[in-house]
Amino acid sequence: MTSVPGDEFVVSVSNLNQRYRNTIALDDVSLAIPSRRMIGMIGPDGVGKSTLLSIVAGVRHLQSGQATVLGGNIADTGFRNSVASRIAYLPQGLGKNLYPTLSVLENVDFFGRLFGQSAEERAFRIDDLLRSTDLEP
């Protein structure tokens, strides 16, 4: 993948390998995502999408390979803790835990409150998400 001059990679992984007992989830995966890009990961069940995303989000320790996220090594506990609040990750199945009586905006706002964000911070982040995903009303 070539980058546009001035772009930084927000995610860069190389030679990732991950196993669950006898099942290979990731086999020598390398990927670079430039900043200011929206991507989608599409594929059948069991090909490693959730495993890759959980490593990038820092919720799963990588077994081998390298993962650089937001300019640092996501395997480093100190770095991971320092950027955790800047990474949004909704694991597969967790969507069942959203509140059906709340709108999407109300659900996002609710979880922002759980993480201690001020009303101003939540409003800023929600507005930013809506703009960056072209979902603004």
List each language-model region with its residue ranges.
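ABC ATPase NBD Q-loop/coupling interface
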Residues: 66-82, 89
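Conserved ABC ATPase "signature" region
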Residues: 109, 113, 120-137
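Short coil-to-beta microelement around the adenine-binding A-loop and adjacent beta1/P-loop entry
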Residues: 23-24, 81
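The feature captures the beta-strand-to-loop junction immediately N-terminal to the Walker
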Residues: 42-44
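Helix-to-loop junction immediately C-terminal to a conserved catalytic motif
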Residues: 57
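Ser/Thr at beta->alpha junctions that act as helix N-caps
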Residues: 101-103
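ABC-family P-loop ATPase nucleotide-binding domain
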Residues: 1-17
